[in-house]
A protein has these predicted regions:
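Conserved pre-motif I regulatory segment
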Residues: 313-354
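An active-site-proximal "capping" alpha-helix that borders the catalytic cofactor pocket
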Residues: 46-59, 127-143
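Acidic/histidine metal-binding catalytic segments
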Residues: 64-93, 143-177, 409-412
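N-terminal accessory nucleic-acid engagement/regulatory domains that precede
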Residues: 1-32, 53, 148-320
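Acidic/His-rich, divalent-metal-binding segments that scaffold phosphate/diphosphate chemistry
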Residues: 1-121
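Conserved Walker A/P-loop ATP-binding site and its immediately adjacent core
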Residues: 379-404, 415-420
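Walker A/P-loop
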Residues: 346-370
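Inter-Walker segment of RecA-like/P-loop motor cores
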Residues: 405-429
Length: 429
């Protein structure tokens, strides 16, 4: 559960993560991956632990627990501690159950070269595992929700909301090897009413029901009606739906990234510790401050008294103050004023800078970004979002002039748009 720490609520993520053997006894009998030469096998338990490790590392490196807490406050509102605990347990363990469907005997036989429980080979879902994992997840957590409601530990409204998340999270799991296309499409497939004929969710449910009944003599939790969930979402505010959309995308991204890193570790023997954060900020700032423009600005800051509004209004192309001339006086004044205002409002979340073209906004933005990285424990990366590719090119050229000789800095700068190839680090990095 979340806990109080120095006045802040924190997800205790590691205590929420379930060991795979608490969910299935088959984690060491079934395999998740084979090496390319098929001489090494990674058990499902080993892969799950790696995924959990990377999931936790990403959350910790990027301080995503603050997003968890904020979403829980804004979306879940005032709920009981038990409902909160179940929500957190469900959220954290998307990564734990995302590949549990690999116990599909046909996946084991065809993909892992492992003849395991071949008497339970499914006929209709082939060797697929993601949709089977989604059904496992649904059954596991719907049972927990129903039990808590039956015991009176959560109320009906809390049960309904938690079930919404169980379906959303199972959808995320079902799509972790593909894109996020359509939740309603997934829901229709679960109930066997998909108009396009893709009822793999229902087929996976039927196989899982047989598998669980044969092995454990236990029933599978019945799925809710499709329209019940959709109608409730339709009456939810747009604001809450935006929160939910962003939350769903975040958990999907976390799962895909953790799965990728974990799989790469097994396949390549490389344990990743680089999550794209800017860790050498002092080196970047030092290099930035050593360029001629910055030296001129800092010299002005040190030796010239700041201009008041009346003096600023009189600045023209012939104005010379110290070693700075014309419009560069205004650029310097804006640079220093924005830096001063930022430092005095460093805990604010949104800043707005408006100035005409040619006034030095790009250089000012560089400086403000670096100041934020330097002052904040939570800022780990800078995104510049531009309306036109020409502006991207201009600002990339500016950065190359400043950092072009420093490969350790330039290697961490990438352009992402429709005309620039993805940046790939070489093997030495």
């Amino acid at each position: 559960m979340s806990k109080e720490c120095d006045g802040k609520m924190l997800f205790n993520i590691k205590s929420l993560m379930l060991p795979l053997d608490s969910i299935t006894e088959f984690g060491d009998e079934c395999y998740a991956h084979l090496s390319e030469d098929e001489t090494q096998k990674e058990t499902l338990t080993e892969h799950t632990r790696r995924c959990q490790k990377y999931w936790f590392n990403i959350v910790e490196a990027k301080h995503i627990e603050t997003v968890f807490i904020k979403f829980e406050q804004l979306y879940m509102g005032d709920i009981t501690n038990e409902a909160r605990h179940i929500f957190e347990l469900m959220s954290v363990n998307v990564v734990t159950l995302h590949d549990i469907g690999k116990i599909n005997p046909l996946f084991q036989k065809l993909k892992m070269k492992n003849s395991w429980k071949v008497e339970y080979v499914p006929e209709s879902i082939s060797s697929r595992h993601s949709i089977v994992s989604a059904i496992f997840y649904l059954d596991y957590f719907l049972d927990i929700i129903n039990t808590a409601k039956g015991d009176g530990r959560i109320n009906r409204d809390e049960s309904d909301v938690l079930k919404d998340f169980a379906y959303i999270y199972s959808y995320i799991i079902s799509r972790h090897h593909s894109d996020m296309n359509n939740l309603e499409y997934f829901f229709s497939g679960l109930t066997g009413k998909n108009t396009e004929g893709d009822n793999s969710g229902k087929d996976a449910y039927d196989w899982y029901e047989m598998f669980k009944q044969e092995l454990y003599k236990e029933p599978v939790v019945k799925l809710r009606k499709r329209d019940e969930w959709l109608n409730r979402m339709a009456y939810q505010s747009n604001e809450k739906n935006i929160y939910l959309y962003a939350w769903t995308r975040l958990l999907y991204s976390l799962l895909v990234a953790a799965d990728y890193y974990a799989t790469s570790e097994f396949m390549n023997g490389y344990e990743n510790n680089d999550y794209g954060n800017v860790n050498n900020i002092d080196n970047i700032i030092n290099e930035y401050e050593n360029n001629d423009v910055q030296k001129s600005i800092r010299n002005y800051e040190k030796n010239i008294k700041r201009l008041d509004e009346e003096q600023l209004a009189k600045v023209n192309k012939d104005t010379v103050i110290g070693n700075i001339k014309g419009i560069n006086v205004l650029r310097t004044e804006m640079f220093l004023e924005t830096e001063y205002n930022l430092k005095n409002n460093i805990d604010s979340k949104i800043f707005y800078l408006e100035a005409p073209t040619g006034s030095g906004k790009s250089n000012t933005a560089f400086n403000l970004s670096f100041q934020l990285l330097k002052k904040s424990d939570y800022c780990k990366k800078i995104f510049y979002v531009y309306p036109f590719n020409t502006l991207v090119e201009q600002n990339m050229n500016s950065m190359e002039k400043i950092f072009g000789q420093k490969q350790d800095i330039m290697s961490n700068i990438a352009v992402v748009n429709s005309i620039t190839p993805y940046k790939v680090k070489n093997s030495s990095n």
